[in-house]
Structure formats: C-alpha cells, structure tokens
C-alpha cells in the first residue's frame, strides 16, 4: 500500500491515526537516554505531530474536548480531599510552599514571554512543558480557541503550543529530578537515606508499651495449634496475644471438643486441649509454635474466612490521628496491607497521620472488618461500579460554571470551561469523601479516565498540530528552539529555587517534607519516585500529597492566564 493510499484510508477513518499515535507514542516515550525517558504523554504528542504531518486526519473537536473534560474531572475528583485538607492550619506551610513554587514559575514564564516576545501558543507550551503539567496545555488551548482571531492564526497558535511543550518538557522533568535529588540535598547538606531513616524512626516511635493491638504490616499466615502449655491454661485471649505482641499474633477461632468458636473476643479464656487458630506474620507463628503446643491440621478452622476490604476514612474525630493512635485498642485481628492518599502510597508507620479520604486496604475477619468500618468510615462495597450520573453531571455543571464571567475594567474574566470542570471535580471528590451516599468512582476507573482522557486529548492535539508544525519550525529555526530551551530552564528552576529558600529559611520545613513538597508543587510524580529510590524509603510520599493537590489546580489555571498575558504583552 502506497503512502497516498494509506493517507486516503486514514482520512476516511481518522481514528486509525488517533490510536496509532498512542501506540507509537508509547514506544517513543520508552526510549531512554542515560536512564531518562520522555514518557508516554510527550511521546504521544510527538507521534501525533508526525502522523498529522503525514496524513492530515481530521479529528473532531468534540472528541478532543470531551476526553479532556473527563481527564480534568478525574484529576479534580482524586485531588479534592487532599486539596481541601490543605486549607487546614496544620497544612498551611505545605500549601504556602505550593503557592510560592507555582506562582514563581508563572512569574518566570511571564518574564520569558516578555523577553522573547513569545506568542500565546508558545507561551502556553512553555508553561505546560517547563512545569510538566499537561492539563495546563489543554486549558491554554481552550483559551486560544476562544480568542478573537482568524482561523489561520488560531491554527498556528494551536500548533505552537504542543511544539513548545515537547521542547521544554524534557528539562522540565530531568532538571527537576536533578535539582531535588542532587542539588538541593547538597545545598541543605543532608544525606537522603539518613534523612529517611531518621524520619522513619520518628514515625515508628511508640509512646505506649501496650502494643498488642497495632496494625500488622506483614504477609498473613494462618496456623492451628493444640494448646498443651499449662502456663496458658485459663488465660484470656488478650493475655495470650500480649505474650506474642512482638509477633503480632491474633486468635481468630477455637475448637473445644465438638464446639467451634469463631470471632473469638479478647476476654475469652483458653483451656488445655483447645485447638487454637492464630493469624500472624511468620515471626509470630514461629514464636507460638515454640510454646503453645503441637501444630495440627484442622481444615475446618483453617477455612475461617479472612476478607479484604478497602475502607475510606470519613469520620471527623479520627482524622489527624496517627496509625498508632487508631490501632491502639481498635485494630485487633486487622492486618494493614497498604495506606493510600490520592495516588500516593503512605508508609505504614505508627507515626503516620491520616486524613479524611485516606483509603485503608485491610485484611481480617468479617467481624474485625465491620468494626473497622464503623470506627473509620465506610467500606467501598461495590468497587466495580461507577456513578455515571455523578460523573456526567459534574462535567455538565463544570462546563456551565466555567462559562460564567465577570468584567474587570472591560476585560472578561472567568475560569473557562477547563477550569470550571476541574474546580467542580475538586468539590465532587471532596463531597464524596465526606458524604459517601452517591458519587462513587472506583480508583481503577479514575485512573482509566485520567490516563485515557489525557492521552486521547494529547494525541488529537498532536495530529492537529502536525501540518502547522513545519511552518513554525521553518519560521523560527534553531533560534526559536534555543530561546524555548533557555526559557524552559529558567521557568523549571525558578519555582523550586524559591521554594527551597522559603521552605528552609522561612517555613523551617525538614528536608523529608521540603524536598517532596517541591516535587509535588511542580506536579512531577517522576521526581517523587526518584526521591524515594535515592532515599530508599516511602516516607517521602507524606510531604508530596498536599503540594501536589494544590499545584495541580493552580498550574492548570495558569494555562489561560499565560495566554492572556502573552496577548497583553504583544500589544
């Protein structure tokens, strides 16, 4: 098949080019140079521009903006609980860090636009690429689409934006990783691994010796033993479990003669000859085996159902407590598999403080899980069903809200449809974390909406920009790329440098909170992953979530702001 024939097929079926851009973009994004890759988003943008140049498919704007709205709503829904939690007094330093980093980045971008006379399209790509926030590219393009210019100018500006984004994105990610993981620790004169160890030790510090009822974090093991140790005769289950507190052992069932006791309470008494079902990590089981008695194969007891559940923390009185405080006296028979806040996995340390909206992945007996749900919030029972009415209604309200405008000195000001959908998504996610009656969107569905919504939008943008990219490159030449790269370096580093100075000298944030806070304020998950890898700990995730949620909103809103600034500076 010739190129001309293939082009005819693509014009008849433009969806071929759309999905081909995603496929090729994946492989382009996987190409590594010194362990640094572009990532799927930028790879798809580049692939889309190439395919758009070759075949010039026509992708309906309806498809592009519909997927982008789904992406924005999913981002807002996920970040909502953390965003509103950042408004609390104890989170104000982290929120201040995010505001300063993102605002400094915007100020640097405006300065670069004024210096190099970038048009609105190049300005939009400069912000989205340098600050690695693809949502800002979409919100800026939405503003460009609303500009009062002819179609040829609008098409050229729309092509300039992804070109600038792809040019500045590489240093936007790599430069921030180097700054946060190498430069900043040297300036602060700290060792990332030592900082992590000290933070973990502080989180694990226990203030109460009665730790028999602390969350177990190890793989679960079930064993049955015949009680043969006379010292344990007539002891309560609570006393028995305290004896093996270091091993975190829980009695979940007893066979006494022909009688089978399930959901055993802590005040139940043991007797010689009982067959005891214990659940524990391996160390606890081994310790019990040495003292309790002979291990037996009681299949009926071993079939005791242990269930897994995701419990969302919604109770106000539990928010702000540490895992140790929650567990003490309330976690018997529960095993904490993981703890999540938004997209971040938190360390399962006794000093980790929880917030409303956090998700506990627990394993335990049905009774223990039910008790935990009453104490913490609610169980996500139907995790496979999405409330489509809530989702679609949220997008509708967001678009209408974004259309509202006020006039300031004759200039119309508003969030725009993109900003409106994002803000409504934030409120929707926050409301669900407080009142989980309607509006459930499971985490896998949110991830799918976010990933597919963004990647389809980026592919469509690339395909539309491809035919005009050659004109932009021809007109600007090497000088344009040099200006973009230089401006991108300034915008990428301006915010983190300001954040480092503010966080260290004014806010007095410890490095374990400051460094991931800078990564979150620049909305770069790759930097957090690099920080956790170099530091050898998940403890850095704690300082990431609040700045990430705040800056996700702010930098997305910077899209139309930078477009407006570029228009004003061009006059």
From Swiss-Prot:
Which Pfam families does the record match to this protein? Answer: Asp-Al_Ex (PF06826)
Molecular function terms in GO for this entry?
monoatomic cation transmembrane transporter activity
What residues does the RCK C-terminal domain cover? Answer: 294-378
The record, for InterPro entries, names:
AAE_transporter, RCK_C, RCK_C_sf, YidE_YbjL
Keywords, A to Z, come to: Cell membrane, Membrane, Transmembrane, Transmembrane helix, Transport
> Matching PROSITE patterns, A to Z?
RCK_C
| Family according to the record | Belongs to the AAE transporter (TC 2.A.81) family.
The identity of this protein, by name, is Uncharacterized transporter BPP2141
């Amino acid at each position: 098949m010739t190129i001309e024939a293939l082009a005819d097929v693509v014009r008849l079926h433009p969806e071929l080019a759309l999905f081909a851009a995603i496929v090729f973009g994946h492989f382009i994004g996987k190409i590594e140079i010194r362990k640094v890759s572009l990532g799927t988003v930028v790879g798809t943008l580049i692939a889309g521009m190439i395919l758009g140049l070759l075949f010039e498919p026509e992708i309906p704007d309806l498809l592009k903006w519909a997927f982008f709205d789904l992406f924005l709503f999913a981002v807002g829904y996920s970040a909502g609980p953390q965003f509103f939690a950042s408004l609390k007094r104890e989170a104000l330093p982290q929120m201040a860090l995010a505001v300063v980093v993102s605002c400094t980045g915007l100020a640097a971008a405006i300065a670069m636009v004024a210096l190099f006379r970038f048009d609105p399209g190049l300005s939009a790509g400069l912000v989205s690429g340098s600050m690695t926030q693809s949502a800002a590219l979409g919100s800026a393009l939405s503003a460009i689409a609303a500009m009062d210019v002819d179609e040829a100018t609008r098409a050229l500006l729309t092509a300039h934006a992804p070109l600038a984004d792809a040019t500045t994105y590489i240093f936007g990610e790599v430069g921030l990783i180097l700054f946060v993981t190498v430069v900043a620790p040297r300036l602060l004169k700290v060792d990332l691994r030592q900082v992590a160890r000290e933070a973990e030790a502080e989180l694990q510090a226990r203030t109460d010796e009665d730790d028999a009822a602390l969350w177990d974090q190890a793989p679960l093991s079930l064993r049955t033993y015949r009680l043969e140790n006379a010292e344990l005769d007539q002891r309560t289950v609570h006393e028995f479990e305290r004896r093996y507190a270091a091993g975190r052992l829980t009695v979940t069932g007893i066979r006494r003669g022909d009688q089978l006791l399930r959901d055993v309470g802590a005040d139940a008494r043991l007797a010689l000859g009982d067959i005891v079902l214990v659940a524990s990590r391996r160390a606890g089981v081994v310790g019990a085996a040495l003292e309790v008695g002979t291990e037996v194969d009681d299949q009926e007891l071993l079939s005791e159902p242990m269930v897994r559940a995701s419990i969302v923390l919604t109770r106000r009185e539990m928010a702000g407590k540490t895992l140790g405080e929650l567990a003490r006296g309330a976690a018997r028979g529960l095993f904490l598999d993981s703890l999540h806040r938004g997209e971040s996995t938190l360390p399962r340390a006794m000093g980790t403080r929880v917030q409303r909206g956090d998700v506990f992945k627990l394993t335990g007996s049905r009774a223990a899980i039910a008790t935990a749900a009453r104490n913490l919030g609610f169980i996500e029972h139907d995790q496979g069903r999405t409330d489509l009415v809530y989702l679609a209604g949220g997008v509708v309200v967001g678009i209408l809200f974004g259309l509202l405008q006020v006039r300031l000195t004759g200039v119309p000001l508003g969030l725009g449809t993109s900003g409106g959908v994002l803000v409504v998504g934030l409120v929707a996610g926050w409301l669900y974390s407080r009142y989980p009656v309607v509006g459930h969107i499971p985490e896998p569905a949110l991830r799918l909406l976010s990933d597919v919504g963004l990647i389809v939008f980026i592919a469509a943008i690339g395909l539309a920009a491809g035919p005009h990219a050659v004109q932009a490159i021809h007109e600007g030449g090497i000088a344009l790329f040099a200006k973009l790269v230089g401006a991108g370096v300034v915008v990428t580093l301006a915010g983190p440098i300001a954040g480092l100075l503010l966080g260290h000298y004014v806010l007095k944030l410890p490095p374990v909170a400051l460094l991931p806070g800078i990564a979150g304020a620049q909305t770069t998950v790759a930097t957090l992953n690099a920080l956790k890898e170099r530091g050898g700990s998940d403890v850095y995730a704690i300082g990431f979530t609040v700045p990430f949620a705040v800056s996700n909103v702010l930098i997305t809103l910077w899209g139309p702001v930078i477009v407006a600034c570029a228009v004003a500076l061009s006059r």
